[in-house]
Amino acid sequence: MLILTRRCAESLIIGDGEITVTVLGVKGNQVRIGVNAPKEVAVHREEIYLRIKKEKDEEPSH
């Protein structure tokens, strides 16, 4: 795992610059981040992604 330190308004770039993650603010133990990615790239919070994956796994296969 790559660990980076960023301040408010600083960003990191993923891949060839198509995905940008920006720190928007820090308040207590919460960090607000913004993700700029192409429409074809799904961006989810981890708990939402896991719920979607679980629902797909539970679908009957034909």
Curated annotation (Swiss-Prot):
Keywords: Activator, Cytoplasm, Repressor, RNA-binding, Translation regulation. Disruption phenotype: Increased expression of aprA (usually repressed by this protein). Partially suppresses a gacA deletion mutant. Double csrA1-csrA2 deletion mutants fully suppress the requirement for GacA/GacS in control of its regulon. Decreased expression and stability of RsmY and RsmZ sRNAs. Pfam families: CsrA (PF02599). GO terms for biological process: mRNA catabolic process; negative regulation of translational initiation; positive regulation of translational initiation; regulation of carbohydrate metabolic process. GO terms for cellular component: cytosol. GO terms for molecular function: mRNA 5'-UTR binding. Belongs to the CsrA/RsmA family. InterPro entries: CsrA, CsrA_sf. A translational regulator that binds mRNA to regulate translation initiation and/or mRNA stability. Post-transcriptionally represses the expression of genes controlled by GacA/GacS. Represses expression of hcnA; alterations in the ribosome-binding site relieve the repression. Binds specifically to small RNAs (sRNA) RsmX, RsmZ and RsmY; these sRNAs fold into secondary structures with multiple GGA sequence in loops to which the CsrA proteins bind. Coiled coil: none annotated. HAMAP family: CsrA. This is Translational regulator CsrA2. Induction: Active throughout the cell cycle. Expressed during exponential and stationary phases; more protein expressed in stationary phase (at protein level). Under partial control of the GacA/GacS two-component regulatory system. The keyword Cytoplasm applies. Homodimer; the beta-strands of each monomer intercalate to form a hydrophobic core, while the alpha-helices form wings that extend away from the core. It is found in: Cytoplasm. The keyword Cell wall biogenesis/degradation does not apply.
